[in-house]
């Protein structure tokens, strides 16, 4: 996400990709050349699933952002506004397909020759030994193809 000021893009957060546009494009060239089209991320403490595109709008891969298990997430900071924030992220980011800033858990991958099954697995609470496993969100990523 970036803002426009006098025709120039300004970084919103220099601790994420919009703060490193040159490096992002170099990274995209590396993963395109290697045909390693799955990018795993996790520092945001929220669940993300995105198609990645370079500056020329060419597909370069899929980003899988893993949730936090105990670190603060969107819901911890914004509570009831989390759904609104998630929707605005999707509206403002062309490649972003899905985001969940509410649940704690982990992401698992089942890797096959031509595709990867991605499963975001969550629990009802991390504040008690008594918890429920929630229904996972799942995606199938085909090799070198954007998710549709």
Predicted feature residues:
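Long, structured stretches of catalytic cores involved in phosphate-ester chemistry, encompassing
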Residues: 1-148
């Amino acid at each position: 996400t970036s803002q426009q000021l006098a025709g120039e893009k300004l970084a919103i957060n220099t601790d994420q990709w919009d703060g490193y546009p040159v490096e992002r494009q170099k990274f995209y060239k590396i993963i395109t050349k290697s045909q390693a089209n799955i990018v795993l991320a996790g520092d945001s403490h929220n669940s993300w699933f995105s198609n990645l595109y370079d500056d020329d709008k060419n597909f370069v891969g899929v980003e899988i952002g893993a949730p936090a298990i105990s670190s603060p997430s969107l819901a911890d900071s914004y509570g009831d506004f989390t759904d609104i924030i998630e929707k605005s992220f999707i509206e403002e980011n062309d490649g972003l397909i899905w985001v969940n800033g509410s649940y704690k858990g982990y992401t698992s991958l089942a890797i096959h020759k031509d595709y990867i099954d991605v499963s975001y697995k969550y629990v009802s609470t991390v504040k008690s030994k008594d918890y429920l496993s929630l229904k996972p969100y799942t995606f199938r990523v085909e090799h070198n193809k954007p998710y549709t």
